[in-house]
Amino acid sequence: MKMLTRLQVLTLALFSKGFLLSLGDHNFLRREIKIEGDLVLGGLFPINEKGTGTEECGRINEDRGIQRLEAMLFAIDEINKDDYLLPGVELGVHILDTCSRDTYALEQSLEFVRASLTKVDEAEYMCPDGSYAIQENIPLLIAGVIGGSYSSVSIQVANLLRLFQIPQISYASTSAKLSDKSRYDYFARTVPPDFYQAKAMAEILRFFNWTYVSTVASEGDYGETGIEAFEQEARLRNICIATAEKVGRSNIRKSYDSVIRELLQKPNARVVVLFMRSDDSRELIAAASRANASFTWVASDGWGAQESIIKGSEHVAYGAITLELASQPVRQFDRYFQSLNPYNNHRNPWFRDFWEQKFQCSLQNKRNHRRVCDKHLAIDSSNYEQESKIMFVVNAVYAMAHALHKMQRTLCPNTTKLCDAMRILDGKKLYRDYLLKINFTAPFNPNKDADSIVKFDTFGDGMGRYNVFNFQNVGGKYSYLKVGHWAETLSLDVDSIHWSRNSVPTSQCSDPCAPNEMKNMQPGDVCCWICIPCEPYEYLADEFTCMDCGPGQWPTADLTGCYDLPEDYIRWEDAWVIGPVTIACLGFMCTCMVVTVFIKHNNTPLVKASGRELCYILLFGVGLSYCMTFFFIAKPSPVICALRRLGLGSSFAICYSALLTKTNCIARIFDGVKNGAQRPKFISPSSQVFICLGLILVQIVMVSVWLILEAPGTRRYTLAEKRETVILKCNVKDSSMLISLTYDVILVILCTVYAFKTRKCPENFNEAKFIGFTMYTTCIIWLAFLPIFYVTSSDYRVQTTTMCISVSLSGFVVLGCLFAPKVHIILFQPQKNVVTHRLHLNRFSVSGTGTTYSQSSASTYVPTVCNGREVLDSTTSSL
């Protein structure tokens, strides 16, 4: 009362009295329930639905109106009979109808504060003798109010009641706004605020991966604040709102049809979230039925598990997911309610209208085209189901009673009756010191567990627990089935849920991506995306990112990670091996055969004249070149890689060092002949061997240094264009391997140059020509090999095969051009493998320990020397 001046109070009183008297202008007689008592509790219930057009009130609300009203009367009766709760104190009631409208409810609630106004101002009406004036029609003094139902109603009423410090407990208002104690400091409720329900609904959407949904809310605090809380929870879970619609208070059919048309404009949003009052939900479902629209509805407790909402539109509501506050049915109330009829229930002025509406009959013989109600009609299990919030109505009445009981025990310790201290209640003390601190087990609840405790938190809110229902058709009968619950976390029995199309519906802005695709989110929209395929070598780090597995790895079948690819290398059973190995084996056999022939005929003139020491070195190099095929085909390992690097260059160095020594010897001899010089130095067999070994040693030293600087090993190599294949290779580049042959190339070039210079030697030295043929052919082979080697770098099998065959062909060139003719003479023309005398002029000859140049006559024998030995005549030396 400190907030109102005395003039404001009187004005409010006048307005309230005049306004309440004017209610009859709407052709709707104001009805109420008044039962006197020591303490009186007010009650606000949506006994009638809101009217249409100019009508304030509509049809009787059978479940949320009549049942809840009777639940309060039932609870009052039980408390008045209780010997332990408020013994000696009789509770009365003053129950009013809100007609499901906040403005109408506010008008009605003015009746609750009239008594407070009267009590406050009674001192102004004192008689001259000191007595108080006698007042007629004194309103009942309200200790507290139970209600309202809709949040918009409770907010309007709470704003009024707080001015007069009248505590209020709602049994159904769930708007989050009502938790604001700075504005609603005399309000409490036995139900939780909507943000718990909004969280539960968002978790249901996330559970089914419904990320693109539409919303519809009723105008007013329940719908608007509820959907706002839902949108906040949805954003936290990356759920997008396709379209957000709101139904106004007009209750016109066209507005609901318009909402359905807007919902149909978003075909990908197959799920529609409803935060609507029950009458709005019913009209929206009816509009969907008229439009033959099919959606999956996820509805708040405004829909709950009410049959009246889906009546006549069951096929449209099939598969809906709805939430209802978790509650236990009050079985004692069932017996009480089923015992009522118009003939024994005279305290409820709306009950006769309820009876006529429920049974579609008339209790009076009126000409309204209705049959007269049979006196044997009764409420039973076939036509009655307890409304879901009956328990909360009963708990609200008992909570107020427990608070009054504790206050009475404190203020009136010596009596069970009311004392003077409670004649005029201190609403502030009642609310803060007693009501917010109550803690008792819910009456009529068979389960004595934590869920049955009734108490309020610091904001005056109840505990947040919800049941999840699914609207199903079982055996041709539609009904709600409990399929889960929410209490901080969601629990669902998915197998029990029925869907309109027999499968979980999808509600996403974009179609789900394939298992090998990632989502490319569109700017400014977390729910719409474009599916982009991952590369074959990428895995899905998450649904938005394809990650490269990296060289040598490949994604698993489910693309959740990567595994190491098996190493690929030439195996002995591969078809590619047949050619190189066959050629190498054939070459090695030929080399062994030549060596055998030479050893067997080691002291024959032909073998001696061929420079057998260099021949054996040359044959060793040729044999080693054939062995390289096996090193290149063997599985790479540090040892094999070292042998490849050492053997390839060394085999060529051995061959071409021996050939270079030979061609150099011939060139120096005949350069000396032309210049008239003395016999060249270092043409003896031992000198030639040392020169050859020296040339070979250079290559060995170079390779050894290379092996030290770059230790041999293996590496897993992957081609950019063939990421699915990992090749096991030696840890050297192909270019490095070829660079290591630079020295051999120099030897080849020098051999070729010397072979070219000695191409016109006398016929006794036609071996120089065969060396020339060898070098020319070798150059052609390697000039052809190099481009093939690099062109086939993408296929290691072809590259390795090319390398092996080229090396083997180089060996065959040496065998074919240099040794095949000699072997042919030795084996098939032994008569030519002899020393013969023939006239030759201008030859170096051996004389004692020195070499002299002389002009010989026809009868003089002048042996030709090279490598310190005589050579045969043109018939043999040319070989």
Swiss-Prot record:
Gene: GRM3
Positions in the Cytoplasmic compartment: 600-613, 665-688, 757-769, 829-879
Organism: Pongo abelii
Assembly mode: Interacts with TAMALIN.
Family named by the database record: Belongs to the G-protein coupled receptor 3 family.
Function: G-protein coupled receptor for glutamate. Ligand binding causes a conformation change that triggers signaling via guanine nucleotide-binding proteins (G proteins) and modulates the activity of down-stream effectors. Signaling inhibits adenylate cyclase activity.
SUPFAM superfamilies: Periplasmic binding protein-like I
Domain of life of the source: Eukaryota
InterPro entries on file: ANF_lig-bd_rcpt, GPCR_3, GPCR_3_9-Cys_dom, GPCR_3_9-Cys_sf, GPCR_3_C, GPCR_3_CS, GPCR_3_mGluR3, GPCR_3_mtglu_rcpt
Regions of this protein lying in the Extracellular compartment: 23-576, 635-645, 710-734, 793-802
Keyword Glycoprotein set for record: yes
Glycosylation site list: 209, 292, 414, 439
Localization: Cell membrane
Transmembrane portions of the chain: 577-599, 614-634, 646-664, 689-709, 735-756, 770-792, 803-828
Protein name: Metabotropic glutamate receptor 3
Disulfides per UniProt: 57-99, 240-527, 361-373, 412-419, 509-528, 513-531, 534-546, 549-562
Residues involved in L-glutamate binding: 151, 172-174, 222, 301, 389
Top-level taxonomy: Eukaryota, Metazoa, Chordata, Craniata, Vertebrata
